[in-house]
Regions:
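Acidic, Mg2+-coordinating active-site environments of NTP-dependent enzymes
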Residues: 1-106, 129, 183-195
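Short, conserved glycine- and acidic-residue-centered signature motifs
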Residues: 60, 113, 149
Length: 198
């Protein structure tokens, strides 16, 4: 269980099973350190071994550490685990990035929940330099959870230099109403950063 996540600690309170923890910050059975976090990937230190992976962000570091811990507990050798982990790549639509000839980086991610969007934008902000802008294009699908729309709008506006709200398959819903629900979550100070396209 992720020891850095308070929800993980809550889950451990009521189990009688043998407990193993992993963390980047807290004391845990399995620890890792992020040495480099770039758009091209992560350089991690796990059990005093360095590992380069083509995955990006803290959330992937936690996922990789969970994989490492599980494989170790199943009896795989450390170097075999690290070698296999180094071959992992992101799936299509998850933090895919392309750099244009003008050195503009575009990132595509299927972040369809507020937490996923927050993780992606925080990861980008942790990697980008101070003079780079983060322009986010985000939409919410129709006939789906309407409660998340204002949350996603607020997160996108807060964590971006500029944000463009657009449609993402409105299905049977009115696209203008979906955009209004997304915009409803934007704070007054962040509203000047937004553009909506129906």
């Amino acid at each position: 269980v992720n020891e850095d996540d308070r929800n993980g600690r809550v889950m451990l309170q009521n189990t009688k099973a043998k407990k193993y923890t992993y963390a980047l910050k807290s004391y845990a059975d399995y620890k890792a350190q992020i040495l480099e976090n770039q758009f091209a990937g992560l350089l991690l230190k796990i059990d005093n071994q360095e590992l380069w992976v083509k995955l990006i962000g803290n959330f992937n570091a936690y996922n990789l550490l969970a994989i490492y811990a599980t494989a170790d507990l199943l009896g795989l050798e450390q170097l075999e685990i690290l070698q296999l982990m180094s071959t992992l790549e992101s799936v299509d639509g998850r933090f895919q990035y392309v750099v244009s000839e003008k050195n503009i980086t575009a990132i595509v991610d299927y972040a369809h929940t507020p937490d996923a969007l927050k993780n992606v934008l925080e990861t980008i902000n942790s990697i980008r330099t101070g003079n780079e802008e983060l322009i986010t294009v985000v939409g919410c699908g129709g006939d789906r959870d309407t409660q998340k729309r204002p949350k996603m709008g607020g997160i996108a506006a807060k964590l971006s230099t500029k944000v463009i709200f657009t449609n993402d398959n409105p299905r049977t819903e009115n696209p203008t109403e979906i955009l209004a629900q997304i915009e409803a979550g934007v704070s007054p100070e962040d509203y000047k950063k937004t553009v909506s396209i129906a």
